Amino acid sequence: MDKSIGVIDSGVGGLTVVHELMRQLPKEQLIYLGDTARCPYGPRSKEEVRQFTWEMVDFLLTKNIKMLVVACNTATAFTLKDLKEQLDIPVIGVIQPGARAAIKSTTNNQVGVIGTEGTISSGAYSQALEKIKSDIQVSGLACPPFVPMVERGVLSGPEAKAVVSEALRPFSNNKEMDTLILGCTHYPLLKSTIQEVMGEEVTVISSSEETARETSTLLDVHQIMNRSDLVPLHQFYTTGDLEIFIEIAKTIFQESHFQMLTIKQANISTNKVW
């Protein structure tokens, strides 16, 4: 079997990217690591996020990966440049693909972005969007309650609706916004509720599909696409509660996909300072 693609996230959110990678690249073998024990990354300092991200990368490098997908917006905002400079394998984040998808979607240049405190305060989405289209109008909103709620497995129902409605209240009077970027890979797990609260006139963008498409392009450019016809066996690791991780994974993946997975607990703590 060919080498695997490594995927990292602060928790279960990156599984939404993995799901799309499995759909678009069915021959590729994936190794996923979710740092659920230290989730969320959003309120943490840049230094902490950088340390935790490099610890995850270090773990995956021992698995001899051929490419890295940073399926965490906060980690992408704070560490992508360093990762690209220091690793000798292709690296992709989720912010640029999400920005490109939003530019394709908007008809009036009014784009909203929701994400963690870290992602929104970094201005990474505004910079990415404005680099593509200088006259874009970007409104950012941090939604701190979303990630902890998703990590508890609350993905729909009255609690999810109440939390999402309250968090998105600042956007309720913005009648011009026609596109909303889910600037955290946890948020697609709440997409139906977010769409309901925002209304059908707003296009809700998840970067997962675009990230998978750009991953495919990078594999092709670097000539590392898996050509084997063997059925891939994906490896998932979590630093946190294994049972909760498995239950959330079951809501994302079909039974046929689930039979192609092994899910284990990982200890990635290290004394090394990155």
Swiss-Prot record:
Catalytic activity of the protein: L-glutamate = D-glutamate
EC primary class: isomerase
Pfam families per UniProt: Asp_Glu_race
Keywords noted in UniProt: Cell shape, Cell wall biogenesis/degradation, Isomerase, Peptidoglycan synthesis
Sequence positions that bind substrate: 9-10, 41-42, 73-74, 185-186
EC number(s) stated in the UniProt entry for this protein: 5.1.1.3
PROSITE patterns in the cross-refs: ASP_GLU_RACEMASE_1, ASP_GLU_RACEMASE_2
General function of this protein: Provides the (R)-glutamate required for cell wall biosynthesis.
Protein name: Glutamate racemase
Listed GO biological process terms: cell wall organization; peptidoglycan biosynthetic process; regulation of cell shape
Recorded GO MF terms: glutamate racemase activity
Pathway, per record: Cell wall biogenesis; peptidoglycan biosynthesis
Coiled-coil blocks: none
Family: Belongs to the aspartate/glutamate racemases family.
Gene name of this polypeptide: murI
Active site: 72 (proton donor/acceptor), 184 (proton donor/acceptor)
